[in-house]
Amino acid sequence: MKFVYLVVTLLVSLSADPQKSSLTTVFGDLDGDNIEEKVLMSENKDGQRMLQIFKQNNSSEWKLWHSFDSIVINSDDGGAMGDPFTELSVSNRVISVSHDGGGGRFTWRYLHKYRYDKKDKTWRVIGATIAYLDKSKKVETLDYNLSTGKAIYTANCIGDDENQDECIDIKNFTFYVKPANPPLMKNFKIGKNKIVIPKFNIEMYY
């Protein structure tokens, strides 16, 4: 899956809370009613980031619908590469949030997808695409659809690590790990969720 970096930085004050500033705002229909919602990534004076979703009322005023405080990684948690946030987008009722970070020998990239469950009236994590790069050994990718349970893992050996002989090239290894229910967005912790690649016993975190 390709990562497209189209970040729009607004840096304007939120009228609802003078302690927060808006960093990125996107629009799209998230609940299937053909009316666009507003999705806003904000940051308070302490650097804590929040993802907020707004709906318009009958007076065309934006009212807060849902809010999440663990979906966007803070600016100082990206390692030597700096601010890890790269993109916020909405398409086909899905919110996508991209990050990358690391530094030196190791770098990482995350793309997570979230969708509103109209039946349960809650938000769930439905997809994760992860890439890890060890410049001296290998690059790994995992594309995981939490709705269907389908996961595709790839590993490409690179570099000159002394343990390079232990590295195995793996191309599009497909397996299924379907949770009983996709994780709730409100409880989700980016990079803290383990999945084990069967046959190879490799651990990945999304």
Residue ranges and their predicted role:
Residues 20, 59-82, 127, 181-184, ...:
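Blade-edge motifs of beta-propeller repeat domains
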Residues 35-36, 48-50, 83, 106-111:
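Short, surface-exposed coil-to-beta transition loops
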